């Protein structure tokens, strides 16, 4: 115990819990805490599912059922997706609703009723994780190019910074497998995460001892093995090569240090930033948690156009750093400049609220960094603030907030 380091995420979690206890003043404190953390866990799992590729979702869906206590899962999901917290609003006309339904299935419960040789680990990265010696496997330029091509569109690596991306490439090991070779086996210990460069692999799940059933397959660009590393759980499925394949393997330590620390730091950074945004000041901490998890950081150089007048609106933006120009062209073709936007200002909401084209152009004035929220997440997470944003449109004649 003397060497144990308190995870950096623990203090803010306990602080948020204390606020909720003071706000609700529950008669049964233990039950309240249980329900609070069940809700928080379900939200985190939904974030993972929302960002996962279809093959990963299929694997989770095929393995989640029997391992989860029905009452516990129902309670957790009811908290996570209840509209009582003001964040359950969905666009009924959205074609992606089926994907959200699938995302509601929780991943396998970790280590329920069984022992593995993997020591229990916190999902939150510790100081030891951050300070760990980096894995560097020598590679040729050709190998590095192949890795980059393989992971370029993978959801887990999409938002890493340059240093983290380099660490991933450095740590990956090439693994060649023959047709018929088992790469991972259900119930085994998870030591590696895999990305498929070439080849084909099938995924099988054995439920209740009734034999292996194929649930999905992987080809070039696919990836698997992250669930066991994220949740410290046994492998949820067996993956078998159906043709000669080339995989890139990322070890457990590097995976957790880079990917999970990135997620943790991103959340902490955005939560602190969102507290300073006036529009979001009325939200509860757990509501800002959800927004922080959904935001994506985008950077622009001087003169870059963020949104263009007349275009269809797909995203909502909050300025993290820098300044932006607001330009509107009237019906006579004359260009008008409005008051510039700064850190904490938001734009892009009007086109999403009204389904109308952009009414102005926003252009970076110097280096600009924004937090971006897609249309579907905007509707789901910022629905309760729609009235406030609609009221703000009355100021657009002197200071257009949509831009």
From Swiss-Prot:
This is cAMP-dependent protein kinase regulatory subunit. The gene is PKAR. GO terms for molecular function: cAMP binding; cAMP-dependent protein kinase inhibitor activity; protein kinase A catalytic subunit binding. Residues 79-125 are annotated as: Disordered. Residues 1-155 are annotated as: Dimerization and phosphorylation. Keywords: cAMP, cAMP-binding, Nucleotide-binding, Phosphoprotein, Repeat. Belongs to the cAMP-dependent kinase regulatory chain family. 3',5'-cyclic AMP 1 binds at residues 156-278. Residues 87-103 have a biased composition (Acidic residues). The modification Phosphoserine is found at residue 117. Tetramer, composed of 2 regulatory (R) and 2 catalytic (C) subunits. In the presence of cAMP it dissociates into 2 active monomeric C subunits and an R dimer that binds four cAMP molecules. 3',5'-cyclic AMP 2 binds at residues 279-403. GO terms for cellular component: cAMP-dependent protein kinase complex; cytosol; nucleus. InterPro entries: cAMP-dep_PK_reg_su-like, cAMP_dep_PK_reg_su, cAMP_dep_PK_reg_su_I/II_a/b, cNMP-bd_CS, cNMP-bd_dom, cNMP-bd_dom_sf, RmlC-like_jellyroll. The keyword Phosphoprotein applies. It comes from the Eukaryota. It comes from Blastocladiella emersonii (Aquatic fungus). It holds the Pfam family cNMP_binding.
């Amino acid at each position: 115990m003397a060497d144990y380091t308190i995870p950096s995420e623990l203090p803010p979690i306990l602080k948020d819990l204390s606020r909720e206890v003071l706000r609700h003043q529950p008669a049964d404190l233990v039950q309240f805490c249980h329900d609070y953390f069940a809700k928080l866990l379900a939200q985190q799992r939904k974030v993972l599912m929302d960002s996962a590729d279809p093959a990963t979702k299929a694997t989770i869906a095929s393995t989640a059922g029997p391992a989860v206590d029905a009452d516990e899962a129902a309670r957790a999901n009811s908290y996570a997706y209840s509209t009582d917290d003001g964040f359950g609003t969905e666009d009924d006309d959205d074609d992606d609703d089926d994907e959200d339904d699938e995302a509601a299935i929780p991943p396998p419960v970790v280590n329920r009723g069984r022992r593995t040789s993997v020591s229990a680990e916190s999902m939150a990265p510790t100081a030891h994780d951050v300070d760990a010696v980096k894995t560097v496997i020598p590679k040729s330029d050709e190998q590095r190019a192949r890795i980059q091509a393989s992971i370029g569109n993978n959801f887990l690596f999409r938002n890493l910074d340059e240093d983290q991306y380099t660490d991933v490439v450095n740590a990956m090991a090439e693994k060649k497998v023959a047709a018929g070779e088992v790469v991972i086996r259900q119930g085994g210990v998870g030591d590696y995460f895999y990305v498929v460069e070439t080849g084909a692999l099938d995924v099988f799940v054995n439920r209740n001892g009734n034999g292996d059933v194929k649930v999905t397959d992987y080809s070039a660009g696919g990836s698997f093995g992250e669930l066991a590393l994220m949740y410290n759980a046994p492998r949820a499925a067996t993956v078998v090569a159906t043709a000669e394949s080339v995989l890139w393997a990322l070890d457990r330590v590097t995976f957790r240090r880079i990917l999970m620390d990135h997620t943790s730091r991103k959340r902490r950074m955005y939560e602190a930033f969102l507290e300073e945004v006036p529009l979001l000041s009325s939200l509860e901490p757990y509501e800002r948690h959800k927004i922080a998890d959904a935001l994506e950081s985008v950077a622009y150089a001087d003169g870059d156009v963020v949104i263009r007048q007349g275009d269809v609106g797909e995203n909502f933006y909050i300025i993290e750093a820098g300044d932006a120009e607001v330009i509107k062209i009237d019906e006579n073709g004359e260009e008008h400049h409005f008051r510039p936007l700064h850190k904490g200002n938001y734009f892009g909401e009007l086109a999403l609220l009204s389904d109308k084209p952009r009414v102005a152009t926003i252009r970076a004035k110097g280096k600009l960094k924004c937090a971006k929220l897609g249309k579907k997440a905007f509707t789901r997470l910022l629905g309760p603030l729609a009235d406030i944003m609609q009221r703000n449109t009355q100021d657009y004649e002197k200071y257009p907030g949509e831009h």
